[in-house]
A protein has these predicted regions:
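Glycan-recognition patch characteristic of GH18 chitinases/ENGases
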Residues: 1-102, 179-182
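Substrate-binding surface in catalytic domains of secreted glycosidases
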Residues: 3-7, 36-54, 115-206
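Extracellular/periplasmic catalytic domains that process cell-envelope and extracellular macromolecules
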Residues: 19-23, 66-70, 75, 105-107, ...
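Solvent-exposed, polar/charged alpha-helical surfaces in well-ordered, non-transmembrane soluble domains
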Residues: 22, 61, 65, 94, ...
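Short acidic catalytic loops
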Residues: 27-31, 103-119, 170
């Protein structure tokens, strides 16, 4: 499986070719950030030299046209924002999940990826795991659901691992210590030993 992130600013600068888009099985648009109570804040791309899409909906529409005829999934990506406060509150977790589902339904999207960086202690891992479980509960099995983890932050609960369709592992940086192939392989082995099934693991490359 080839899963790729699409950010509007890079796309508008011509850094993502149509060939690359069409070669991907899964395209994730990092366009939404959670507020602490669960509402969504959308990030619109900036035009480059007066050209390019300037709304997240327009960006998705543009890419959808370029991958027409392929089996590529078109998904929403959630990141940053007040995610730690949101996942720590049961009502906010539910509101967030329901809001995501509404966006997926309205825009005919194939699913959601959570890229929340980073849980730093046991409580934050527990809260994040509960948010993952709530998202699956609200979405059901209709939508493709993944999370993005990192070798320094991957210890979500076993139930959360079971709840997602796959997990992408950012085992390529940003620290240069992760650049050697030996470190790349050992990071992958580490999360496998933790309990992430190999059939659910998508190892990242820069």
């Amino acid at each position: 499986m080839i899963s790729s992130y699409v950010r509007g600013h890079f796309y508008n600068r011509g850094r993502i070719s149509t060939e690359s888009l069409r070669a991907s099985d899964d395209l994730i648009f990092l366009s939404v950030h959670p507020n602490k109570d669960g509402p969504l804040l959308f990030e619109n791309p900036r035009a480059f030299q007066g050209k390019g899409e300037t709304t997240w909906e327009g960006l998705i529409k543009s890419v959808r046209g370029k991958v027409k005829g392929t089996k590529a999934k078109i998904r929403l990506g959630a990141s940053s924002g007040e995610w730690k406060a949101m996942v720590a509150d049961e009502a906010a977790r539910t509101t967030f999940a329901k809001n995501i589902k509404k966006v997926l339904e309205k825009n005919n999207l194939d699913g959601i990826d959570l890229d929340f960086e980073w849980a730093e202690n046991e409580k934050e891992y527990e809260d994040y795991s509960l948010a993952i479980l709530k998202m699956r509960e609200v979405l059901g099995d209709k939508y493709l659901f993944s999370v993005s983890l990192h070798p320094v932050c991957y210890k979500i609960s076993k139930k959360a691992i079971e709840a997602v369709d796959f997990i992408s592992l950012q085992c390529y940086g940003p620290s240069p210590v992760r650049f050697p192939i030996e470190k790349y392989c050992s990071d992958i082995q580490m999360v496998l030993e933790y309990g992430i099934p190999k059939e659910k693991l998508v190892a990242g490359v820069p």
